[in-house]
Amino acid sequence: DTQMIQHQSGILADVPSQARHLYFALESQEGLQTALEGLSRLADGDSLVVGFGESLVNALGARVEGLRTFPALTGAGVDVPSTQHALWCWLRGDDRGELLHRARELEAALAPALRPVRMAEAFRYGIGRDLTGYEDGTENPEGEDAEAAAIVGAGTEQVAGGSFAAVQHWLHDLNLIQARTQIGRAHV
């Protein structure tokens, strides 16, 4: 009697060629139910993956076991801020113009209860490397191991099929990286 757990397929899919991450703040409880109904019509879990932040879950009077604010981290020469949002929407696709139109549709559906506060465009470079040439994801599990690592399993009815996301924004000093790469090559 194995129950099939449904999840947002975009979580395990390959990185799309283009994407837009939209972050929203809870502006008002009024109209929130209507906004979430609009969101549910647009979110298919593949071309639009969504994540609820702790403030939105609390506003809905719900509780998600394991959901908590990611702590800010500091160390020698390193500051990792913790920027929380009520709602995260990951628009995935192949065409930047189409993503822009879908983002506008999404923002209209969520207003006035949820207000956009940040947008980040993303893209896949080459075979999945970042702009420094580093191939990301080489340590990520694949197949059933990936599903076990990324998708909350059975026995947790409230969140079965869900995932916890920590979305990171990296700023690279490409000039410095290029200079170090050239210096390294000169010494080989």
Stretches with model-predicted labels:
Residues 1-187:
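Long, histidine/aromatic-enriched segments associated with O2/redox biology
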